[in-house]
């Protein structure tokens, strides 16, 4: 692989992907594969921060119809992201690479509190930084968290890992005529209503001029391929 396109990025990983072929929980082979991909990508000379969802363990929006308030449900979901980050941290460190989990919540017995200074320091030290706890506030998705944290730590792009190789005009699994876009502007992504990322995340990325690269995580090495400019995906920028 050649020189990396970006030197500091935030990678957004779906919590559901952590479950592997299961409908719930953490699939260790999947976590191990992701850890290996992150380490390989870091070896390209890229400083890597990761935001992980919590949908493999808990989805706050789904319990709001069952008597749990949306703020409480979202908080439970954000705590699920901490568990995912700790599992990924352990998988990375088993490979003799340093990782640190920083949380939006104060939980000193578990992990450090996220601050910009701590994130900058650990990235400069060559550690993979795992950003847990969402924004720390209800009603915001982990997609929005990824864009927010990218702005805070000076990342050059957000890499949004999905189960398809970019943004399509329709669901390619349901519509074989769906068109894949090589590039979209932030405004086009918002106006098109594409479901690959929520509108708040796209709007914040537009406001901060932050590129988002949507790609498939299904194959090993896909993160490194995107970072080296050889991967297949959709660039949302401009």
UniProtKB/Swiss-Prot annotation:
The EC number(s) this enzyme carries: 2.7.4.22
Keyword Repressor: no
Principal subcellular localization: cytoplasm
Activity regulation statement: Inhibited by UTP.
Binding-site positions, UMP: 54, 74, 135-142
Keywords carried by this UniProt record: ATP-binding, Cytoplasm, Kinase, Nucleotide-binding, Pyrimidine biosynthesis, Transferase
Matches recorded under Pfam families: AA_kinase (PF00696)
Location of the protein in the cell: Cytoplasm
Residues engaged in binding ATP: 12-15, 55, 59, 162-163, 168, 171
Pathway participation: Pyrimidine metabolism; CTP biosynthesis via de novo pathway; UDP from UMP (UMPK route): step 1/1
GO cellular component: cytosol
InterPro entries reported in the protein's UniProt record: AceGlu_kinase-like_sf, Asp/Glu/Uridylate_kinase, Uridylate_kinase, Uridylate_kinase_bac
GO molecular function, a single term: UMP kinase activity
Record has Transferase as a keyword: yes
Catalytic activity: UMP + ATP = UDP + ADP
GO biological process: 'de novo' CTP biosynthetic process; UDP biosynthetic process
NCBIfam families named in the record: pyrH_bact (TIGR02075)
Described purpose of this protein according to its UniProt entry: Catalyzes the reversible phosphorylation of UMP to UDP.
Quaternary structure (record): Homohexamer.
Similarity field: Belongs to the UMP kinase family.
Protein name, entry field: Uridylate kinase
Gene name per UniProt: pyrH
